[in-house]
Amino acid sequence: MGYLLLPMEGKTTPATHSYASRAILFAWALCLFSLPRQLAADPLTSRALIDQPAGSNEPFGLVMEKVATGPLVEKWLQIQREIDDERLTLKICEQSRASCPRTSLQFFSIIQNGRKLEGRARFGEINRSVNLRIRPMSDKANFGEDDFWSSPLTTFARGAGDCEDYAIAKFAALQEAGVSSDDLRIIILRDTIRQTHHAALAARLQGRWLMLDNRRMIMIEDRQVRGYQPIFLLHRRGISLFIGDLRISSSALKPSFHVRGGE
């Protein structure tokens, strides 16, 4: 299941399906070629299938430790501030579509479509729409930087982004569509087969965590994930490091530790 490109739920035309498949394949390939040097020097010991010990309500059921400071925390706080600032633009779009910038209107339309649905259908609509609207592109090609986290409206204005940009856009869209931030997590994971890193959104529905990934249209539960090992969890209250049964070097726990998500 880990690397199969699954078809979209619902009806699609052959042209739409072909485009979507090519886009996902390209996004999947792009993410494989960005291994953070900080982690590459000290890889994690991991399994293909993630176990879920009892006693945790977070994705993957693993124990976590809060990360208080460091570049990753600063980067996430900055993105949250930008998401909050962009709510003003979305409010303008809600009051007058004619006054809404075109690319902002695209993002707002995804939110509106999500609001019309509930539960899994809402998650699926936003997952598919964001996956199709954003072209996969590395930070280097898009911004001229090795690591740049883009706010949702910036990503939509560019029409392109890497895996954490997809996850950030879905995080913001689901919040605006009515999903509590308590039920949303951005997960930074290690691809244990390709030895690279990736980011995806986890959304909780009726006590179960669904993975919204730019590599696939179909959402799967965290317990079904294969080929990934979770490392960091980003949520409204901050960042946590998955510890559980993982063996991570002491350098990973230092405040200055920095992870760059894959493209």
State the predicted function of each range.
Residues 23-34:
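Bacterial N-terminal signal peptides
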Residues 15, 20-23:
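Acidic, Ala/Val/Gly-enriched low-complexity intrinsically disordered segments
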Residues 2-9, 14, 37-263:
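A structural boundary/capping signal
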